Regions:
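Rhodanese-like catalytic fold shared by cysteine-dependent sulfurtransferases
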Residues: 2-8, 14-55, 64-94, 103-141
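Structural scaffold elements adjacent to functional motifs in cytosolic proteins
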Residues: 57-59
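Short, surface-exposed ligand- or partner-binding patches at beta-edge/loop junctions that are enriched
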Residues: 98
């Protein structure tokens, strides 16, 4: 009977040892996730970074979309002109990108990555999610 109990304890201990998780790599921004090689962050988690004294926050929507209301502090560089306006951005500083839903900002992040920018981050859900989160907007007057 004693050998059965010992065997059971050993079996449980070995089974539990196999369930350990691998240590996770600590990052500066654990909220940033990567989709197809492009970093993405939620609007709530992006807010402190884009409200910093110096931040690069780019709205890649059309000028008409931008004029109808945009995330506070975002500058407008439409996606179709981004490649021609790379000189307006600092390559060695993070660039936060936003559009309407998150698709164009993901494309913009890919353009910046290919151009050698150190960190380009798409705002998940775009302006729609930004507004829904109650975050500051610059509305048309």
């Amino acid at each position: 009977m004693r050998s059965i109990i010992i065997a059971t304890i050993v079996f449980i201990a070995v089974s539990l040892a196999g369930c350990q998780t691998a240590p996770t790599k600590k990052t500066d921004s654990p909220a940033v996730v990567t989709k197809m090689g492009v970093s993405e962050i939620s609007p709530i988690e992006a807010r402190p970074a884009v409200e910093a004294a110096y931040s690069q926050f780019v709205d890649v929507r059309t000028p008409e979309e931008y004029a109808s209301g945009h995330a506070y502090r975002a500058i407008n560089i439409p996606l179709d002109t981004l490649a021609a306006n790379l000189d307006k951005l600092e390559k060695n500083e993070p660039v936060y990108l936003i559009c309407q839903s998150g698709k164009r900002s993901m494309k913009a992040a890919e353009i910046l990555d290919q151009a050698g920018f150190s960190q380009s981050i798409s705002i998940a859900g775009g302006t729609t999610a930004w507004r829904a989160g109650g975050l500051p907007m610059a509305e048309r007057k």
